[in-house]
Amino acid sequence: MEIENKKPTILLMHGSGLSHIVWSLHEQFYTSQGFNVLSIDLPGHGNSDGPSLKSIEDISNWVKKLMEKVKVSKISLVGHSQGCLVGIDFASRYPDLIDKLVLVAGSYKMPVNQDLIDLAEAGDEKALLLMMKWGYEGSKAFIGGNPVKKIINSTREIREILAVDLNACNNYKDGKESLEKINCPTLCIFGD
């Protein structure tokens, strides 16, 4: 992707076990509105190489390095679920690099049920089914009504991606303190 420095840049950060696919329509819309859009896959996710990053802080540092690589000086970060934790951490640690923050369906702390972590670490598809049930129950607005099979495709991905992400969320303890340090405009979007 070529970045046009005169345009503002939006970074779209997916949630646990997911990839840039979840932002496809948003990416098209924001691009058509004149924004640079970085719809990323975290390491180990989607089309990205390397192992999954094991902590929210590691992901924040990776985002900073990505910005340096693509020569972007400031971003508006839109984070979903785990991406909210990354957004909170990033905005508190790198205030000069963030213009705006949008948090979608997340919180400053995300304790994860140990049974769910255990299922993911075992590569059990039930971990995915439970997440989709809790997060999207009743929704048919996804790929063929079934987001699970199109986003995460194997038990290896459940073990090596989803389990790592769930542990990163569960182990992030600096959320409240980080939230208090944020000084950029922030929009929180939550449902019931």
Labelled PLM ranges:
Residues 42-45, 106, 169:
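Active-site loop/turn elements of alpha/beta-hydrolase fold enzymes
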Residues 118-183:
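Conserved alpha/beta-hydrolase catalytic His-Asp/Glu region
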Residues 58-75:
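Conserved acidic catalytic loop of the alpha/beta-hydrolase fold
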Residues 41, 76, 99-102, 180:
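Residue in the alpha/beta-hydrolase core beta-strand immediately N-terminal to the catalytic nucleophile
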Residues 2-49:
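Conserved HGGG/HGGXW glycine-rich cap/lid loop of the alpha/beta-hydrolase fold
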Residues 85-129:
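Flexible "cap/lid" loop of the alpha/beta hydrolase fold
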Residues 13-15, 80, 190-191:
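The conserved beta1-alpha1 loop
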